[in-house]
Design a protein with these regions (language model features):
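PAS/PAS-like sensory domains across diverse signaling proteins
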Residues: 41-43, 53
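Sensor-regulatory modules in signal-transduction proteins
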Residues: 121-123
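N-terminal capping loop/helix in small sensory signaling domains highlighted by a polar->aromatic N-x2-3-F motif
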Residues: 48-51
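PAS-family sensory modules
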Residues: 1-33, 92-95, 132-145
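Terminal output helix/cap of sensory domains in signal transduction proteins
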Residues: 59-108
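Sensory-domain boundary capping and coupling elements
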Residues: 116-118, 129-135
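Conserved hydrophobic beta-strand signature of PAS-family and PAS-like sensory domains
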Residues: 35, 44-45
Length: 185
């Protein structure tokens, strides 16, 4: 089954469990993907064991905000503050956020690429009460994309006669290759 269909299935299972009140530890703890919830202010209120395995740390309920990961980076390597992550955006805009990829850095320095599925939760009156997020590990796919980018940059560097352009492309190739290697660990 394609990964996005599996992800959507797990998310639907989590949303159904939350809607029926059958939350901890029964349904969500059994899911093999990281799932966590926050209140309307972004404070983490629940996480399953897969979150710890993915993030390399145990989130602190009520203290961690927006995400269960230690640090987040964009795919271009820029630090993404937690208050600007897709989960924060979903709560702020009161809508589901789809289609992004981010890099989680664990406390031990290892990195995992992931696709988040932040989805706001509303009470029966339509008032925002929090959000649920599922993190799908896409490290292998992202490592391959970055390795391919490194190869392209090297080919372009080899084909150009401008020393400065060659240097920039070679540097980009090294950065792409290094990040791909980190994700492949």
């Amino acid at each position: 089954m394609p990964q996005h269909l599996t992800a959507e299935h797990y998310l639907d299972t989590a949303l159904e469990a939350l809607a029926t009140g059958d939350v901890c530890p029964s349904v969500l703890d059994k899911l093999p993907v990281p799932i966590y919830t926050t209140d309307e202010a972004g404070a983490v209120t629940y996480w399953n064991r897969a979150c710890v395995d993915f993030a390399g740390r145990e989130p602190t309920l009520g203290e961690d905000h927006w995400c269960v990961t230690w640090q987040i980076y964009t795919t271009s390597g820029d630090r993404l503050p937690h208050h600007k992550c897709p989960m924060a955006q979903a709560i702020r805009e009161e809508r589901s956020i789809r289609g992004s990829v981010a890099i989680a850095m664990r406390p031990d320095g290892t990195r995992r690429a992931f696709t988040p599925y932040p989805t706001p939760l509303f009470d029966d009156d339509g008032k925002l009460i929090g959000a649920v997020n599922m993190l799908v590990d896409v490290s292998a796919e992202q490592a391959q994309v970055l390795a391919d980018q490194a190869k392209r940059c090297r080919r372009l560097a080899d084909a150009t006669y401008d020393r400065q352009t060659c240097g920039v492309l070679s540097n980009m190739a090294e950065q792409f290759a290094a990040t791909a290697e980190q994700l492949a660990l």
